[in-house]
Amino acid sequence: EKENENMARVKSQKSQKRRKAFVRFLPIYILMLPGLIYLFINNYMPLPGLVIAFKQYNAGKGIYGSPWVGLKNFEYLFTTSDAFVITRNTILYNVAFIVINTTLAIAVAIILSELEGKRKKVYQSAILLPNLLSTVIIGYLVFAFFSVENGFINNTILKALGKDPVSWHSEPKYWPFILTFLRIWKGMGYGMVIYLATITGIDPSLYEAAVMDGATKWQQTKHITMPCIKPVLIMMLILDAGKIFYSDFGLFYQATGGIPASLYNVASTFDTYIYKAIQSSAPIGKTAAASFFQSVCCCATILLTNWLVKKVDEDSAII
């Protein structure tokens, strides 16, 4: 009986602790609630619709009443001439974005960490501001700069240099550089803030000891800053690798003015392909197959990247 009483007392104490912990963290749970609802609605509720990729979807029969076609929708995706173009563009653009964006974000964060006072906050805000801009606004900015008749570059810069105006939207050779610049300009501020916060959290005594030993700024960066931000850097790279088959639809579609035929080979990605396929009344099963393939590739990429990281440094892996 005493043992039963002791067990009951222990259980009662544990339940009380749980209740106290729940009440203590209730404000945090409430703050999490909108995000969890958004995640559930946008990421989990659509999951049953994955079967559309394997069906000849008929709106009248519904998702589960439509006939199965197996992998025929995927066959269509891989046999079309667009498959190579959209896969190549999506991967190459994302690799360029990750490498350049990460390098510049770390470099700018290190430079800003050396500044003090109002200048630091001004530079931080200026670099982060483009990240807050809508891609629609960026599309209008691109039009203002690259319009053939009224664009700033043609009417001001090229005119002053005595050069003929350029029909930018008819010249695909320029757009890999334009799109890369726009993506870095828009996205670098986010990474910079994360790396700057990590650098700010490094123990100042490490730098003080390095200065006393006569270490240069480069040596401090190499032997103190970089090792300290390494876990965050690896985590960011793994998360970026998970999005390597996704593209910024707004950037590619809005900045190019809807991807005209002249820019199709340099600006088409998985996301723009799916959108245009839906617009052209293509069978929903085929567009669902493209989206499903995209998701599977992203999942495989993040697992592969995490596995490689675990082989090199197990503590830095996120799974």
What do the PLM-derived regions correspond to, one by one?
Residues 20-319:
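A structural signal for multi-pass alpha-helical bundles of membrane permease subunits
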